[in-house]
């Protein structure tokens, strides 16, 4: 005799919700990609890190390609910061307890205090940036996606080389 475990049921429902969310997000990903000509991505929170779900490939020869299911760091990525800034404090604290603040280069946020300051800025601005914090030469701009209850259920972001993502492009992306 077999029965579904609670964890498996939870994963199934999470997957169902992500699928419906993906159907809603995909046209916006494509629009964003078409506006800025860079790869536009969508991801959600996993158990301890973010999880990349889907992308609309940029139009340039050099572009970023990610595999669905690939985890991303929360402390040095635009989507991670965008989601974390809007989580309820208790949920945010749980994720913070898992974080190791791995240093990738001199721009990486490496302390809880600095990260919380960054999240406060993100909350005021409404969007997050990864300004070469994980990969030198790469900039990401991301914003949270909220469900019908106002909970940050994911993020949408663009990634590209810093030479192509000028301040003007970033400003236009934020407006989009």
Roles of regions detected by a PLM:
Residues 61-134:
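Short, solvent-exposed recognition segments
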Residues 110-176:
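Extended hydrophobic
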Residues 2, 50-51:
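Hydrophobic residues embedded in beta-strands of well-ordered beta-sheets
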Residues 6, 46, 154:
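A cytosolic small-molecule/anion-sensing beta-strand core signal
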Residues 29-37, 41:
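Short regulatory alpha-helical segment in sensory/regulatory domains of signaling proteins that mediates
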Residues 1-18, 22-23:
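N-terminal helix-turn-helix
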Residues 42-47, 56:
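Short hydrophobic alpha-helical segments used for membrane anchoring or interfacial signaling
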């Amino acid at each position: 005799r077999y029965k579904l475990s609670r964890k498996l049921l939870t994963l199934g429902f999470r997957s169902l919700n992500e699928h419906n969310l993906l159907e809603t997000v995909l046209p916006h990903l494509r629009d964003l990609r078409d506006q800025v000509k860079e790869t536009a991505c969508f991801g959600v929170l996993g158990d301890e890190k973010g999880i990349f779900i889907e992308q609309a490939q940029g139009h340039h020869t050099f572009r970023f390609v990610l595999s669905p299911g690939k985890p991303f760091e929360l402390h040095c990525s635009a989507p991670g910061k965008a989601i974390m800034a809007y989580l309820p404090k208790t949920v945010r604290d749980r994720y913070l307890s898992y974080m190791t603040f791995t240093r990738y280069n001199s721009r990486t946020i490496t302390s809880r205090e600095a990260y919380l300051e960054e999240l406060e800025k993100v909350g005021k601005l409404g969007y997050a940036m990864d300004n070469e914090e994980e990969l030198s030469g790469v900039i990401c701009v991301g914003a949270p996606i909220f469900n019908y209850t106002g909970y940050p259920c994911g993020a949408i972001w663009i990634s590209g080389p810093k030479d192509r993502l000028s301040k003007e492009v970033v400003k236009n992306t934020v407006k989009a």
